[in-house]
């Protein structure tokens, strides 16, 4: 799953709209839409992804490959 796919999945599960996300991040609706839907780039930078996930109650972490993954976690490839 890509970073953008992860964001969309979380937004759907938590019923977060682009407007809600924009408000939480203090950015314009257009900027929020671009983070979630932009096709200009293959994926989103880790710093922007971490900021966006934080606004949705998640965080971006690096863990050892052999570590157990919690059920509520997402693996970003």
Q: Residue ranges of each PLM-predicted region?
A:
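Short, charged recognition helix plus adjacent turn
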Residues: 34, 54, 61-77
